[in-house]
Amino acid sequence: MNLIEVRNVYKQYKNGVTALSDINVSIPKGSFVFVIGSTASGKSTLIKLLYRQEKPSRGEVYVGGVNVAKLKNRRVYKLRRKLGIVFQDYKLLPNLTVYENVAFALEIYGLPEKEVRKKVMAAIEKVGLKEKYRTYPDNLSGGEQQRVSIARAIVNNPKILICDEPTGNLDPTTSMEIMEIINKINEEGTTVIMATHDRDIVNKYKKRVIKISKGILTDDKEKGAYIEWWIN
């Protein structure tokens, strides 16, 4: 059964720019999918459709059986409870510690403090920051900040982890460390969709690769690769 279905999707902005044109993608539960393409190719727009940051101009986007394109704004929070989202720029709150940043994602659930602590510490340990749970973001490296971002995204055990250029600001060694964490999360059953420019990661992990070029899905390969001439 497919956890995500994108059917005949078009996205055109008010300025007349067409970001996506007739996109069709099916993603089964437990998959790991890289979405690649050059800058302004439309790959980030496709990612944003999945968590309803954007709405399609035409077509349908199903996530967990729900057509998110028709979801009313007041219902979007229910969709995002099922998702974990990791951004390129971390989006951490600088005045909160590692623990507090991760716990912040659970505030809306009204969970008992004991359960919150258990979930938060488990997520922090999974990303390898157990010894730094009291540290503030300014005292962490870029890679450590991204680990916090991942912990926050997975603290409520989402069915889907959406990563939009999660290694874009990191050096190659740190990027591989972050990718190892994301891959392990996938191996534990979480579906992962990751937009990336990182050729080395794509070529090393040999996952399914979807290529977007000028708003068009031009290739979709199992165990694909990132080839420079193919990207252009």
Role assignments for model-derived ranges:
Residues 172-174:
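Helix N-cap at the start of a conserved alpha-helix in ABC-type nucleotide-binding domains
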Residues 161-164:
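Catalytic Walker B motif of ABC-type/P-loop ATPase nucleotide-binding domains
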Residues 96-104:
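Short coil-to-helix segment of the ABC ATPase nucleotide-binding domain corresponding to the Q-loop/switch region
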